[in-house]
């Protein structure tokens, strides 16, 4: 069973937005502050704990269960490893590409962990979820009320904002039945024009907050190459302080809301307002035109 005092959070966001990197760096900072944390990777790539463990997890719940014949044949210590600052790390895994439902791994893993006492003596459980998929098995942490606080990693790019709005729509669907709430948007900067202002505007429209603006810094890539979090690789760096600031905000966050997703027309109008998209009249003129024709 799960302790009712544990805060169960989940990080969602467009594929490639830096969600796993942002979540691991933030959770590392939270662990530095004395928080007891478990990460449940909900991505078939099984890379949600790589920076914590200095390596990709050698096995996953679903892979080992397939080898043994049943998840009941597993031992907790075989799939739960200890990483940086004592963070517990589990990867749910998934089937081979094109075979079966990857979301099944999430359901199987969480049930196994709950039944085997993995949730004892924890302050936070964090689910790191694949891309912007909010249907079926990948929505399971939301749908079943496992994750109570959702943090959406986004940026000032159109598709990242589009994904954030879609995820907000998924949260709204289960907000009343499961009690899930949106904790805020994390802007993982891509250095687009007026990016912080744009994401704050989007957050307001979604009835939430931009909980933190994470600036772009090459030190993140340097740490990743060494399979380390920034806080471990360069603890005194400015970027490390940014992740600590975000960690404190999540620990102290009491602004948990039911989101108000917006229509595509409103999102496009917002992008036009900030110069990401051309206005409709100009847009209509360039649709379907090759580069030479628009010079």
UniProtKB/Swiss-Prot annotation:
Positions bearing ADP-ribosylarginine: 104
Keyword Cytoplasm: no
Domain of life: Bacteria
GO biological process: nitrogen fixation
Pfam families: Fer4_NifH
Cofactor section: [4Fe-4S] cluster
Uppermost EC category: oxidoreductase
EC number, as in UniProt: 1.18.6.1
Keyword annotations from UniProtKB, A to Z: 4Fe-4S, ADP-ribosylation, ATP-binding, Iron, Iron-sulfur, Metal-binding, Nitrogen fixation, Nucleotide-binding, Oxidoreductase
Molecular function, one GO term: 4 iron, 4 sulfur cluster binding
Keyword Nucleotide-binding: yes
Chain sites annotated for binding [4Fe-4S] cluster: 101, 135
Reactions this protein catalyses: N2 + 8 reduced [2Fe-2S]-[ferredoxin] + 16 ATP + 16 H2O = H2 + 8 oxidized [2Fe-2S]-[ferredoxin] + 2 NH4(+) + 16 ADP + 16 phosphate + 6 H(+)
Binding site for ATP: 13-20
Cofactor binding summary note: Binds 1 [4Fe-4S] cluster per dimer.
PANTHER family for this protein: LIGHT-INDEPENDENT PROTOCHLOROPHYLLIDE REDUCTASE IRON-SULFUR ATP-BINDING PROTEIN (PTHR42864:SF2)
Annotated family: Belongs to the NifH/BchL/ChlL family.
Function: The key enzymatic reactions in nitrogen fixation are catalyzed by the nitrogenase complex, which has 2 components: the iron protein and the molybdenum-iron protein.
Assembly notes: Homodimer.
UniProt-recorded name of the protein: Nitrogenase iron protein
Annotated source species: Nostoc sp. (strain PCC 6720)
């Amino acid at each position: 069973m799960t302790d009712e005092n544990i805060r169960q959070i989940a990080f969602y966001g467009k594929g490639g937005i830096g969600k796993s990197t942002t979540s691991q760096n933030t959770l590392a900072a939270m662990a530095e502050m004395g928080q007891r944390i478990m990460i449940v990777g909900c991505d078939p790539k099984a890379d949600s704990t790589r920076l914590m463990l200095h390596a990709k997890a050698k096995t996953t719940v679903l892979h080992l269960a397939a080898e043994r014949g049943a998840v009941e044949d597993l031992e907790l210590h075989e799939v739960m490893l200890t990483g940086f600052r004592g963070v517990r790390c589990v990867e749910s895994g998934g089937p081979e590409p094109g075979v079966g439902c990857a979301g099944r791994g999430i359901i199987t893993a969480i049930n196994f962990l709950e039944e085997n006492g993995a949730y004892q003596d924890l302050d936070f459980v964090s689910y790191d979820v694949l891309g912007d998929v909010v249907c079926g098995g990948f929505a399971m942490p939301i749908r079943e009320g496992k994750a109570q606080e959702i943090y959406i990693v986004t940026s000032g790019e159109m598709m990242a904002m589009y994904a954030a709005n879609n995820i907000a729509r998924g949260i709204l669907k289960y907000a009343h039945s499961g009690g899930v709430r949106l904790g805020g948007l994390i802007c993982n900067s891509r250095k687009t024009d007026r990016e912080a202002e744009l994401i704050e505007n989007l957050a307001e429209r979604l009835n939430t907050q931009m909980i933190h603006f994470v600036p772009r810094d090459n030190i993140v890539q340097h740490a990743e190459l060494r399979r380390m979090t920034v806080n471990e690789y360069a603890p005194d760096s400015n970027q490390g302080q940014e992740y600590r600031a975000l960690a404190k905000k999540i620990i102290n966050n009491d602004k948990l809301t039911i989101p108000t997703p917006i229509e595509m027309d409103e999102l496009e109008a917002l992008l036009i307002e900030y110069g990401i998209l051309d206005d409709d009249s100009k847009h209509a003129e360039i649709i379907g035109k090759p580069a030479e024709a628009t010079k």
